[in-house]
Amino acid sequence: MNEEKKIALKLEILAREKEAIRRKLVITARQLAVTAKEKESARRSLVVTARKLAVIAKEKEVARRKLVITAKQLKKMSETLENKVLARTKDLEQIRSRTEAILTSIGDGLVVVDKDGKISYINKSFEEMLGWKSGEVLGKSMVQVVPREDQNGIKVLFEERILTQVLSGQKFVADLTNPFYYIRKDKSRFPTSSIVAPVVLGGKIVGAVEVFRDITKEKEIDKAKTEFVSLASHQLRTPLSTVNWYSEMLLAGDAGEVTSNQKKYLEEIYRGNQRMVELVNTLLDVSRIEMGTFIVELKSTNIVRLVRSVVEEQKPQIDDKKITFLSSFEDNIPLMQADPKLLRMVIQNLLSNAIKYTPDKGRVEVSLFLDNKKNVILKISDTGYGIPKNQHNKIFTKLFRADNVIGKDTEGTGLGLYIAKSIVEQAKGKIWFESDENKGSTFFVVLPLRETRK
Amino acid sequence: MKSKTKNRTILVVEDERPLVQAIETKLEKNGFDVITARTVEQAARYLEEINNIEAIWLDHYLPGDKTGLDFVAMLKSPDSKWKKLPVFIVSNTASNNNVRSYLRLGVSKYCVKADHRLDEIVTEIADFLDNPEK
């Protein structure tokens, strides 16, 4: 190879290399262009992000400012609230101590129980009257802590306690007629009068409040009254006995013969005086009933015989008025536990009323029959004046006499039915009547037999 | 009216003058010899002094410190020589407690003046003395 050829070859190689480089450069340039574009787009997105961040930052700042304000407000509010609560608490405290002071200072004993009858509050008077300290009785059953007994020292059963009845939703009961006693911690007792009321929250009984007081003083006054009545009646009876006995002796001729006219006058004196004696006796009975000094002596009593003897006793009046008298007694009426004297008074009152308030030639019926073997029923009916409908509810009231008989020539005190009702109810019986004016009346008495065998 | 061969002596303890007179008259008409006293003390003295007293008619409330009840308590005490003497209480104080106390002490009868005729009471006493075991 010659030189020229060699150079030409070398040049050609160079040219080729150049071309290769140029191509490479073109490629690189293209690549660079692409990168530049990418960079530009990245820059742009960065700008957007930066702007967004700026916005968020601004928002954040706004929010922060708001929060600062709210926090301040909250602080202020909480301070106000705190102050208010403090003031309110103070008020409440005042009210509470006021209430407490009032409850504590009540002269009557006071006890609050929950729905189970457990003591949740007692006042000072409770402590003083019963000898228990608050700490000893809180949470304990009132009925157990403070036993209650009747006049005769018989304990009132749990289920019969007013407190129990009130808590079980029974209607409010306040029995002031029968005195009862509360037993102190030291087992001594005092007569009590109490009132129990339920505590109702949202329509439900959640407990009860009982207020009670010591009625020793009242009892003493009552006793004095009884003694006074007894003494007064004694004083009344003495002159009555004098009139009674002297007119009796005059009538008997103990002071010489009396003319028939004198006899008539003496008989009037005697009868008038007899009425006075009966009146005093009736008044005595009423005062005994009212003062609870009626002594009940239960005995095995034959009620049929009792009714028969009362009828026998009133036979003259029945015959006088030509009254048709009928009686019927169921067979096998057993002996019953009753006070014959008191039972007799009931029968006497009802029968004498029937006779008294039935015009001549009327009809009176007496019957005795059993009901379920547990009760005996006495039924006394007449065809008399009857009781006006509008006075039915008053007929057992003391001293009440119906309009339609006051005008008639009948004696009466308005005490008979009052006494009868008191006796029947004391014996745990019932008394009622049916009556139509000018047709007659029927009285019913239901008495528990409390049967006794001979 | 029963005729008696020998009169019975009865001590009437009652303070109300008109009543005493009536009681005395009625009892005498029924064949009793009557001694009257106004107080428990007086009655006790008569009992000691007069030894043929067969019965006592006694009121409850009497003047002085002692009531009929005190007198009966004394009469019926275990070592009393009048333990068996029948006592009839005739009083207007029918307090249940008094009646019970009298009957517990062993009096023969208790009756309320105002509720009884005088001749009724006298007859009852006479009958009782005739048949003491009844």
What are these regions (language model features)?
Chain B
Residues 14:
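Conserved acidic carboxylate
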Residues 102-109:
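As written
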Residues 17-36, 40-41:
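Two-component/phosphorelay signaling modules centered on CheY-like receiver
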Residues 52-54, 80-86:
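His-Asp phosphorelay/catalytic-motif detector in bacterial-type signaling
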Residues 67-83:
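Short amphipathic alpha-helix used as the core "switch/output" element in two-component signaling
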Residues 36-55, 63, 120:
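Acidic, metal-coordinating helix/loop segments flanking the phosphotransfer/catalytic sites
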Residues 1-11, 116-134:
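Non-catalytic signal-transmission and effector/linker regions of two-component phosphorelay proteins
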